[in-house]
Every structure is written in structure tokens, then in C-alpha cells.
């Protein structure tokens, strides 16, 4: 007979999450040349639920560091998922695109965790129905590997190699009341 126990490890605390968001904001400023007069209009679109508050925080940091205001919004991927047959009853989330739309802009999709790549593929499909940006980039707080699709992030806060059976959770103050990144491991113990 075996018994399963879970071990929860805190990988990033509140200060770590804050520093990581600041680092991603600096990378976005540098890569997009936001402070250049020739720069494309840049917007951050969060993927619900964790990507939305992350996009807002990144926009705040970008403005703090560069003086440039960046529009934020949200893109709902519910109807674009490839696993609707497995879980057909999902709550739709609002999609909010900044005024002026996404045509001829640089859109940075923001999500909390990058895993298989399927969520990002769904977000790309959703964006295609909204408009045609010049560039689409991806910013994630955590990249845990295990891609099933050829997707990679342009901006990564923390690379966390994990086992497929492990669970990475990003907690954000706006949703969970605190900032942290945890890893849950299922440990099996055999009974003799």
C-alpha cells in the first residue's frame, strides 16, 4: 500500500517576485527601445487570470523606469483552447483591447507560467481574430519547460526546470492576497 504526501516548496517570495517583475520590465524597455521616438506602440496583454495583474504591474514598472506609459489589456483564450472537449464548461473571461486596437503595434502577451505552450498558442489564435500587430512577444514570470509546441518566451523571470508531475503555482496579491511562487511535489512512500 502506498500513501501520497505533498511537499510544498516556496521558490520565490514577495521580494523575489517584485525583483523579477522589475527585471522583466527593464528587459522590455531595452528590447523594444520604448524610450525611442521611432519605437512601435507597445501594449501588454495579460492572459487571465495570472497574466492580467502581471501585465499591469509590468506597465507600472516600465513607466516608473522609462517615463513611457504602456497600455494594458486582457485576451481571453477560452474558446481557442484545444482541450475544450475535456473540460467543456469553462467561464469566459473578458477580453479588453486598448483603444486603437493592436494593428501595427508590438503586443507583449503576459502569462504567469509557461508550460506546454498550448495556452500561448490559444492566445495567438485569439489575437489573430482581433487584429494584426507588427510583432508579438511573450513575457512570463516562470518558464517550467516541458513544451509540447514550439513556443518560447522573449522575457523570462525565472527558469524552473521541473518534473511533469510537479505543480508550479504563482500567487499574486491581486488574486491570492500575497506574492509567491511555489512548487508542489507528490512524494510516494511505500508501506511494508
Curated annotation (Swiss-Prot):
Gene3D superfamilies: 3.40.50.2020. GO terms for biological process: regulation of DNA-templated transcription. Keywords: Glycosyltransferase, Transcription, Transcription regulation, Transferase. The keyword Transferase applies. One of its GO terms (molecular function) is uracil phosphoribosyltransferase activity. A motif (PRPP-binding) lies at residues 107-119. Pfam families: Pribosyltran. It catalyses: UMP + diphosphate = 5-phospho-alpha-D-ribose 1-diphosphate + uracil. Its EC number is 2.4.2.9. SUPFAM superfamilies: PRTase-like (SSF53271). The keyword Glycosyltransferase applies. Substrate binds at residues 49-50, 90, 111-119, 144, 168. Regulates the transcription of the pyrimidine nucleotide (pyr) operon in response to exogenous pyrimidines. Also displays a weak uracil phosphoribosyltransferase activity which is not physiologically significant. Belongs to the purine/pyrimidine phosphoribosyltransferase family. PyrR subfamily. This is Bifunctional protein PyrR.
Amino acid at each position: 500500500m502506498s500513501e501520497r504526501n505533498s511537499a510544498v516548496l516556496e521558490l520565490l517570495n514577495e521580494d523575489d517576485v517584485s525583483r523579477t517583475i522589475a527585471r522583466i520590465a527593464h528587459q522590455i524597455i531595452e528590447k523594444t527601445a520604448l524610450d525611442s521616438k521611432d519605437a512601435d506602440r507597445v501594449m501588454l496583454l495579460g492572459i487571465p487570470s495570472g497574466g492580467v495583474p502581471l501585465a499591469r504591474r509590468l506597465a507600472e514598472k516600465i513607466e516608473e523606469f522609462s517615463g513611457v506609459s504602456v497600455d494594458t489589456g486582457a485576451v481571453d483564450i477560452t474558446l481557442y483552447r484545444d482541450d475544450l472537449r475535456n473540460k467543456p464548461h469553462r467561464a469566459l473571461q473578458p477580453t479588453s483591447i486598448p483603444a486603437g486596437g493592436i494593428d501595427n503595434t508590438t503586443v507583449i502577451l503576459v502569462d504567469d507560467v509557461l508550460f506546454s505552450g498550448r495556452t500561448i498558442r490559444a492566445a495567438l489564435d485569439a489575437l489573430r481574430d482581433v487584429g494584426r500587430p507588427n510583432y508579438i512577444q511573450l513575457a512570463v514570470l516562470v518558464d517550467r519547460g516541458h513544451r509540447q509546441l514550439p513556443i518560447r518566451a522573449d522575457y523570462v523571470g525565472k527558469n524552473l526546470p521541473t518534473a511533469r508531475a510537479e505543480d508550479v503555482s504563482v500567487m499574486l496579491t491581486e488574486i491570492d492576497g500575497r506574492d509567491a511562487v511555489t512548487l508542489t511535489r507528490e512524494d510516494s512512500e511505500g508501506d511494508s
